[in-house]
Amino acid sequence: MPDAVVFSPGGYRYIPAVFQYSAGIAAEPGFEIERVRFHRPVPLAEAFVAVESHLRAIGRPTTSFAQCELRSPDPFNDQGFIDFNTEYVKTLERWGIYKDRVNPVARTNVCPMYDKPTTPSMFAFSYTVPTTSAAKRPSFQLAGGGDARGGSAPYKDRIVAFGDTSPEGLREKVVFVIEEMESRLKTLGLGWADAVSTQLYTVQNIGHLVGPELARRGCGAGGLVWNYTRPPVIGLEYEMDVRGAVRETVL
């Protein structure tokens, strides 16, 4: 995994990943991360306007935008995901964040099985704010990570235990993803003790794995939240992210 890179205009560091998102972010000294959740997911174009308005109201630049959580109607095919992401990053480019296919903003994008939005929408977002006192604890947000290895091959060629939702197939997927989360935490100089909450995103029955493969590692100290959703690309079955904001509010 690459080393974290400082995004000075935003007051945070990030783990480089792909053009559509980074693998995670953490506040730099002198800053901390706040998370804002919409009461219900807001269509993406409207949400970006709301984010700009919120940041302006608290005196923060758009470059302080560090992470977001999206909800989409259904999983994309490979090309559909590329097309969506190409459109998504245009706003980040306008905000002075995204440039030359480098994107410091972390992101989770999942698809609810029920109560799904009619269009890709934003559920929550995070940003940095300056602090004048020493941080009581580090603040960070990890991007959603699914059961696919990195690379440029089609997803079906990279998905761990592709098409296998047997108990052992799911175990292989869950272990792969949680080890990825642990690697990201380590890269940011963090551990499970720093997490506020850990989120699971799947419609598969992973109850037999929560104890031995998840809670046993320490990721449940702040609570494990199981979202009955699917990852954003057809064929993926399991995703996780980890939150560590210092404050969370609901608009």
Curated annotation (Swiss-Prot):
Pathway annotation: Xenobiotic degradation; 4-chloronitrobenzene degradation; Xenobiotic degradation; nitrobenzene degradation
Catalytic activity: (2Z,4E)-2-aminomuconate + H2O = (2Z,4E)-2-hydroxyhexa-2,4-dienedioate + NH4(+)
GO biological process: catabolic process
Source domain of life: Bacteria
Keywords: Aromatic hydrocarbons catabolism, Hydrolase, Plasmid
Regulation affecting activity: Cysteine residue modifying agents such as p-chloromercuribenzoate and the SH-binding metals Zn(2+), Ni(2+) and Cu(2+) completely inhibit deaminase activity, whereas Ca(2+), Mg(2+) and the histidine residue-modifying agent diethyl pyrocarbonate inhibit the activity by 23 to 50%.
Example of a GO MF term: hydrolase activity, acting on carbon-nitrogen (but not peptide) bonds
Inducing stimuli: By 4-chloronitrobenzene.
EC numbers, comma separated: 3.5.99.11
Function per UniProt: Involved in the biodegradation of xenobiotic compounds, such as nitrobenzene and 4-chloronitrobenzene (4-CNB). CnbZ preferentially catalyzes the deamination of 2-amino-5-chloromuconate (2A5CM) to yield 2-hydroxy-5-chloromuconate (2H5CM). Also able to catalyze the deamination of 2-aminomuconate to yield 2-hydroxymuconate, which spontaneously converts into its keto form, 2-oxalocrotonate.
Subunit architecture: Monomer.
Protein name: 2-amino-5-chloromuconate deaminase
